[in-house]
């Protein structure tokens, strides 16, 4: 099982050109499934796994209170693996094709008000870490890029003259993301007054090209970024469950509330399908309903 799984991951990296972050998610999901089949059924070959075994795995996930979207993602990973193994003639048939995908719950994205965003962005201090964190928060909100996209930014991806970032999104698709004046000012402050101090901590002979650095002068991790965002959320006493992705949701929602065209927002977010962007129109409708019910005398 392990060798076939590793071959599949190499296929995703080499042939599909998927990002390290996406391949890592495939690895985690499929390793969990592999361990389940080993421990529960003593199955050690993918060719031995039937659709009934996969159903048991899905039932296990449901018992563990995994969200439907997470379960659907794990099943999708299994299907992709089985499709690959069938094509490579490592298994006789693709039994995963017999399973229906769990219906995803259509959750409205969590987003902040403009006032809450301002409080969050102004929470970091004036030390090197605070200047870095403020720049990170500004970039999230002003550009709407994903966590993985921000994490992967190098100095050469930033053009201060034009005010654009070159980001690599899902499927290794590159796009330009505009930065507003506030984000540019925060980045310049970080570049001139904080990044050089952090870079001094780097013991490596080679310079680090990463835009955002940690206390060791190397690229900050995605986990650390999440942790820093959570810290400032707690400081501002926000009632929302805020993550870096919440700032992306806020970016899209505030653009639409300001009258932006849905197609333009799709381009800015890097969505392949406009149906993914349309969920933000539901957010606006929910907001309008709330305002109407609260303030209209005939509601």
Curated annotation (Swiss-Prot):
Q: In its UniProt record, which GO terms are filed under biological process?
A: cell division; chromosome segregation; DNA transposition
The cross-references to Gene3D superfamilies, in alphabetical order and at most eight, read: 1.10.150.130, Intergrase catalytic core (1.10.443.10)
Domain spans labelled Tyr recombinase: 107-293
Which keywords does this Swiss-Prot/TrEMBL entry list? Cell cycle, Cell division, Chromosome partition, Cytoplasm, DNA integration, DNA recombination, DNA-binding
**In the UniProt entry, which residues are flagged as the active site?**
146, 170, 245, 248, 271, 280
Q: Where does the protein end up?
A: Cytoplasm
Residue ranges annotated for the Core-binding (CB) domain, each copy included = 1-86
Give GO MF terms, alphabetically. Answer: DNA binding; tyrosine-based site-specific recombinase activity
Q: What does this protein do?
A: Site-specific tyrosine recombinase, which acts by catalyzing the cutting and rejoining of the recombining DNA molecules. The XerC-XerD complex is essential to convert dimers of the bacterial chromosome into monomers to permit their segregation at cell division. It also contributes to the segregational stability of plasmids.
HAMAP family (alphabetical): Recomb_XerC_XerD
What protein name applies here? Tyrosine recombinase XerC
Organism listed in the record: Natranaerobius thermophilus (strain ATCC BAA-1301 / DSM 18059 / JW/NM-WN-LF)
């Amino acid at each position: 099982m392990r060798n076939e799984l590793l071959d599949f991951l190499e296929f995703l990296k080499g042939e599909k050109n998927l990002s390290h972050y996406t391949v890592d998610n495939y690895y985690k999901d499929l390793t969990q499934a592999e361990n389940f089949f080993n421990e529960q059924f003593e199955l050690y070959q993918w060719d031995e796994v039937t659709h009934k075994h996969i159903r048991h795995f899905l039932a296990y996930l449901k018992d563990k209170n995994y969200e439907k979207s997470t379960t659907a993602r794990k099943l999708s990973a299994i299907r992709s693996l089985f499709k690959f193994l069938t094509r490579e003639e490592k298994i006789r048939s693709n039994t995963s094709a017999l399973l229906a995908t769990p219906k995803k719950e259509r959750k409205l994205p969590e987003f902040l008000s403009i006032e809450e965003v301002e409080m969050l962005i102004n929470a970091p201090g004036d030390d090197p870490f605070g200047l870095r964190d403020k720049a990170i928060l500004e970039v999230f909100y002003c550009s709407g890029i994903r966590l993985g996209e921000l994490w992967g930014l190098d100095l050469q991806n930033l053009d201060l003259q034009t005010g654009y970032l070159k980001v690599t999104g899902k499927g290794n698709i590159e796009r330009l993301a505009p930065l507003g004046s506030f984000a540019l000012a925060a980045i310049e402050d970080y570049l001139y007054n904080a990044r050089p101090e952090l870079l001094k901590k780097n013991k490596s002979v080679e310079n680090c090209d990463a835009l955002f650095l940690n206390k060791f002068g190397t690229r900050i991790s995605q986990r650390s970024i999440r942790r820093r965002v959570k810290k400032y959320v707690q400081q501002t006493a926000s009632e929302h469950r805020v993550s870096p992705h919440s700032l992306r949701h806020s970016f899209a929602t505030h653009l639409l509330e300001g009258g932006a065209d849905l197609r333009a927002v799709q381009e800015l977010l890097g969505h392949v399908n406009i149906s993914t962007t349309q969920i933000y129109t539901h957010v606006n409708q929910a907001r309008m309903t709330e305002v109407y019910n609260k303030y209209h005398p005939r509601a």
